[in-house]
From Swiss-Prot:
It comes from the Eukaryota. Pfam families: Aurora-A_bind (PF09041), TPX2 (PF06886), TPX2_importin (PF12214). Residues 126-137, 166-180, 207-218 have a biased composition (Basic and acidic residues). This is Targeting protein for Xklp2. Keywords: Acetylation, Apoptosis, Cell cycle, Cell division, Cytoplasm, Cytoskeleton, Isopeptide bond, Microtubule, Mitosis, Nucleus, Phosphoprotein, Ubl conjugation. Signal peptide: none annotated. GO terms for cellular component: cytoplasm; microtubule; nucleus; spindle; spindle pole. It comes from Pongo abelii (Sumatran orangutan). The gene is TPX2. InterPro entries: Aurora-A-bd, TPX2_C, TPX2_central_dom, TPX2_fam. It is found in: Nucleus; Cytoplasm, Cytoskeleton, Spindle; Cytoplasm, Cytoskeleton, Spindle pole. There is a cross-link at K476, K640, K732 (Glycyl lysine isopeptide (Lys-Gly) (interchain with G-Cter in SUMO2)).
């Protein structure tokens, strides 16, 4: 951790060096004599006081030999830092500054108080308080060590040059301060040795960023005011005209400007945290700055227009530019090589250098202006009237009029009537060919065939009836039953169902579908239109009903009579009543009745019923029952005769006549338009010829050279300079005077 080092005062002996004598050229050899004597004296004093061992083996002018102040730690709570600093100041005030024993006292104090680590606060407010406290300590110590010192004896800072010239105001103020101090404390001046004070460069007041910004803004305002004045003068000269002589501005005497260090503008670091000063050889660093640039010969002044304030509203010429579609822009961007890949030509570099040839020469030859009107807007897509008329002409030329042949009846003069249509014969009625009549005829022919005479023909008797029994089925040989022991001992014996319990399954009667009657037309049953009532989908009503039923059931159970306890009578133990013993009958052998035999008989029976039903339906379908004939009683169909009026002759207009009139009007209009165009072209040609003649006359007038008179200017008055000659002073290369 870095330790906080307070500023210290230097106890110098009574015999001090006069720095004004160092400016003499003859004393340059013994410049370092005073510093060597000073270092030897300090080593002697420290050796006597017992601290000489600390400084052995070190050069006398090292910074390590300098005295270190007492370290006080920083604490965030309470103002302990300020209290410790005040105690330190009191201790320093009690000890005289010129006493050599002060080193011993401070060494003893530093031994007693152990070095504590510094606690650095990162807050800006704490840093500002620290800076103010340090400034206050520096001022207090500067007052204590203030002695009657001549200003010429103050050591120069590292950045300032040693110069004999000083402002009279500063000298006067310095003399006043020294005289006042000498008058107020004559006794102190006698007792104390004269000590060189701190140089003024170290007592700089640090400015805040706000003050620096204000200074910058003030400077900028002053520059703007000066520029305005110059512009006004230049404007007056320009308005006065070219013929008047231009007044040259008289060069003023150089004004002395105070030093302005750029380091003051930077944000300063804490003085305790700055890096140690590195010693640099002054002679090696000399003449490293760049050489002064050669003066460039200025050419003639080129008159430039005033950059006055103008409106920011864009005009039509500025806004409108060549229209390039977005697709074309994208394609150009991908095809274009970036500028950074293009090689620069040497001509561009040559043009950058200032030269007399770069001044533009005003040409006297007339030149046509390079107008950019064709690039202002996008190309016009709509066609002009001239183009439209040309297209119409082409269409008219392409269209060929073809006249129809003349009808000779028009010239005859008689009325042209339409041809009469041919007379159609009257409708002949045709009788209806009904299907019923055909069926009646077919039925009569069938009846005649049925009435034919029946003759009996005997058939031969089958021999099988005589040989064997026919129609009785053979008796099936049943298998012998195998006896099995009855399973009485089994607990989980499955009892076979008795025949009484078994319900006889009725055989499923398969009904054949009726044969459709193809004579009757099919009429589908139209479903009845029912309006569906929209009900809300909810379970609330159902839940409520269920809850009501539940409550009703609970009430009924509650209303029911409470069962009364009735004790059973005691049994009679005298007689033992046992159930009668049931004697089971012996199993009798019965023939087996298989389900397969029963199923086959049922199937044969159902098949027989189906055949009978089909035959009956076929017979019913064969019998046709005709509907009564109502056509005979109705009136026959008679077509109605149309009652058309006689055709009346109407006036008519031929399309050829109409087209001929329109054609004549069009030709007349076309001839008028052509005549107007020819007249306009003739007028335009005449105007153009007149303009050319006027332009030639104007150019001839302008080309006649008129020489300007020779201008007369005031003679130059050469004035001798009032400034004194520069006195050469040898430079002070030694860095020892820089504190």
């Amino acid at each position: 951790m870095s330790q906080v080092k307070s500023s210290y005062s230097y106890d110098a002996p009574s015999d001090f060096i006069n720095f004004s004598s160092l400016d003499d050229e003859g004393d340059t050899q013994n410049i370092d004599s005073w510093f060597e004597e000073k270092a030897n004296l300090e080593n002697k004093l420290l050796g006597k006081s017992g601290t000489g061992g600390l400084f052995q083996g070190k050069t006398p002018l090292r910074k390590a030999n300098l005295q270190q102040a007492i370290v006080t730690p920083l604490k965030p709570v309470d103002n302990t830092y300020y209290k410790e600093a005040e105690k330190e100041n009191l201790v320093e005030q009690s000890i005289p500054s010129n006493a050599c024993s002060s080193l011993e006292v401070e060494a003893a104090i530093s031994r007693k108080t152990p070095a504590q680590p510094q606690r650095r606060s990162l807050r800006l407010s704490a840093q500002k308080d620290l800076k103010q406290k340090e400034k206050h300590n520096v001022k207090m110590k500067a007052k204590r060590c203030a002695t009657p010192v001549i200003i010429d004896e103050i050591l120069p800072s590292k950045k300032m040059k040693v110069s004999n010239k000083k402002k009279p105001e500063e000298e006067g103020s310095a003399h006043r301060d020294t005289s006042e101090k000498n008058a107020s404390s004559p006794e102190k001046a006698k007792g104390r040795h004269t000590v060189p004070c701190m140089p003024p460069a170290k007592q700089k007041v640090l400015k805040s960023t706000e003050e620096q910004e204000l200074e910058k803004s003030m400077k900028m305002q002053q520059e703007v005011v000066e520029m305005r004045k110059k512009n006004e003068e230049f404007k007056k000269l320009a308005l006065a005209g070219i013929g008047q002589p231009v007044k040259k501005s008289v060069s003023q005497v150089t004004k002395s400007i105070d030093f302005h260090f750029r380091t003051d503008e930077r944000i300063k670091q804490h003085p305790k945290n700055q890096e140690e000063y590195k010693e640099v050889n002054f002679t090696s660093e000399l003449r490293k700055h760049p050489s002064s640039p050669a003066r460039v010969t200025k050419g003639c002044t080129v008159v430039k227009p005033f950059n006055l304030s103008q409106g920011k509203k864009r005009t039509f010429d500025e806004t409108v530019s060549t229209y390039v579609p977005l697709a074309q822009q994208v394609e150009d961007f991908h095809k274009r090589t970036p500028n950074r890949y293009h090689l620069r030509s040497k001509k561009d570099d040559i043009n950058l250098l200032p030269s007399k040839s770069s001044v533009t020469k005003i040409g006297r030859d007339p030149q046509t202006p390079v107008l950019q009107t064709k690039y202002r807007a996008r190309p016009v897509t709509c066609k002009s009237t001239a183009e439209l008329e040309a297209e119409e002409l082409e269409k008219l030329q392409q269209y060929k009029f073809k006249a129809r042949e003349l009808d000779p009846r028009i010239l005859e003069g008689g009325p042209i009537l339409p041809k009469k249509p041919p007379v159609k014969p009257p409708t002949e009625p045709i009788g209806f060919d009904l299907e019923i009549e055909k069926r009646i005829q077919e039925r009569e022919s069938k009846k005649k065939s049925e009435d034919e005479h029946f003759e009996f023909h005997s058939r031969p008797c089958p021999t099988k009836i005589l040989e064997d029994v026919v129609g009785v089925p053979e008796k099936k040989v049943l298998p012998i039953t195998v006896p099995k022991s009855p399973a009485f001992a089994l607990k989980n014996r499955i009892r076979m169902p008795t025949e009484e319990d078994e319900e006889e399954d009725e055989p499923v009667v398969i009904k054949a579908q009726p044969v459709p009657h193809y004579g009757v037309p099919f009429k589908p049953q139209i479903p009845e239109a029912r309006t569906v009532e929209i009900c809300p989908f909810s379970f609330d009503s159902r839940d409520k009903e269920r809850q009501l039923q539940k409550e009703k059931k609970i009430k009924e159970l509650q209303k029911g009579e409470v069962p009364k306890f009735k004790a059973l009578p005691l049994p009679h133990f005298d007689t033992i009543n046992l159930p009668e013993k049931k004697v089971k009958n012996v199993t009798q052998i019965e023939p087996f009745c298989l389900e397969t035999d029963r199923g086959g008989a049922l199937k044969a029976q159902t098949w027989k019923h189906q055949l009978e039903e089909e035959l009956r339906q076929q017979k019913e379908a064969a019998c046709f029952k005709a509907r009564p004939n109502t056509v005979i009683s109705q009136e026959p169909f008679v077509p109605k005769k149309e009652k058309k009026s006689v055709a009346v002759q109407e006036p008519f207009q031929l399309a050829t006549e109409k087209r001929a009139k329109e054609r004549q009007e069009l030709e007349k209009r076309m001839a008028e338009v052509e005549a107007q165009k020819a007249q306009q072209l003739e007028e335009a040609r005449q105007q153009e010829e007149e303009q050319k003649k006027e332009e030639l006359a104007r150019l001839r007038r302008e080309l006649v050279h008129k020489a300007n008179p020779i201008r007369k200017y005031q003679g130059l008055e050469i004035k001798s300079s009032d400034q004194p000659l520069t006195v050469p002073v040898s430079p002070k290369f030694s860095t020892r005077f820089h504190c």
